Amino acid sequence: MARYLGPKLKLSRREGTDLFLKSGVRAIESKCRNRLDVAPGQHGARKPRLSDYGSQLREKQKVRRIYGILERQFRNYYTEANRLKGNTGENLLVLLEGRLDNVVYRMGFAATRAEARQLVSHKSIVVNGRVVNIPSYQVSVDDVVAVREKSKKQARIKASLELATQREKPTWLEVDATKMEGVFKRTPERSDLSADINEHLIVELYSK
C-alpha cells in the first residue's frame, strides 16, 4: 500500500498541530523553529479563512495523517463506524484506536505509529501468542499484545519503551514493560482520547 514518504514535520505544519509522527526525542517546536502554526510553502504565513467544507476537510486530513491511513481505508472506517450503534464520530475514533499498529504504539513498543506498523509487518508482534502481521488488525478487549520473543533484543524497542515513560499512559491499556507485553483492558471512551480532534467535522464531511 502506498505511503507518504516525505518530510513528517511538513504534515504537522500543514495541519497546524503536532501529529505525533516523530519520536518525541526533541520537542516538535524546536524542530520547526516555532513555526508549527505556519503552513509549509512560499505563502505559508498567509492563513486563508476556511469555509465549512475546508474546515471539515482539514480535520479529516489531520486525523487520517495521525493514524497513517490512506483515504480509501479511512472512508471504510467511517462506513463501519456509521453502521455501528452509537455516536458515529466516537465509533470512528474507537476503531482507529483499536488498530494493532496503534495499540503497539500506545503500549510504548514503538516510538511512532509508522514504526509500530513496521514492527507488525515484520512479524515482531504477537496477539494472544500468535504472530499477527496485519497493521489494521482490530484488537479486542482482553487481547494480550506482546513483542515476539526473538524481537525483544531490538534496540529500537527498548529505546521506545524508555521514551514511553515520558508520555501519558492510556488508562484502557495495561502494560508490563519488563515482559514487553500488554493487555487491551477495555474500549477507550471519548474522554480518554485527544480533545484536539473534532470528529463531528468528519461526520459532517462524509454525511454530505
Swiss-Prot record:
* The protein's role, per its UniProt record: One of the primary rRNA binding proteins, it binds directly to 16S rRNA where it nucleates assembly of the body of the 30S subunit. With S5 and S12 plays an important role in translational accuracy.
Q: What is the name of the protein in this document?
A: Small ribosomal subunit protein uS4
Pfam families recorded for this chain? Ribosomal_S4 (PF00163), S4 (PF01479)
Tell me which InterPro entries the record gives: Ribosomal_uS4, Ribosomal_uS4_bac-type, Ribosomal_uS4_CS, Ribosomal_uS4_N, S4_RNA-bd, S4_RNA-bd_sf
Q: Does the keyword Ribosomal protein apply?
A: yes
The molecular function terms of the Gene Ontology recorded here are: rRNA binding; structural constituent of ribosome
Q: NCBIfam families given for it?
A: PRK05327.1, rpsD_bact
Q: Do you know which HAMAP family this protein is assigned to?
A: Ribosomal_uS4_B (MF_01306_B)
Q: Which SMART domains match?
A: Ribosomal_S4, S4
Tell me the Gene Ontology biological-process terms attached to this UniProt entry: ribosomal small subunit biogenesis; translation
Q: PROSITE patterns from the xrefs?
A: RIBOSOMAL_S4 (PS00632), S4 (PS50889)
CC per GO annotation: small ribosomal subunit
Q: Does the keyword RNA-binding apply?
A: yes
What Gene3D superfamilies does UniProt report for this protein, alphabetically?
Ribosomal Protein S4 Delta 41, Chain A, domain 1, RNA-binding S4 domain
Q: What is the protein's quaternary organization?
A: Part of the 30S ribosomal subunit. Contacts protein S5. The interaction surface between S4 and S5 is involved in control of translational fidelity.
Gene name of the encoded protein: rpsD
Q: From which source organism is this entry? A: Actinobacillus pleuropneumoniae serotype 5b (strain L20)
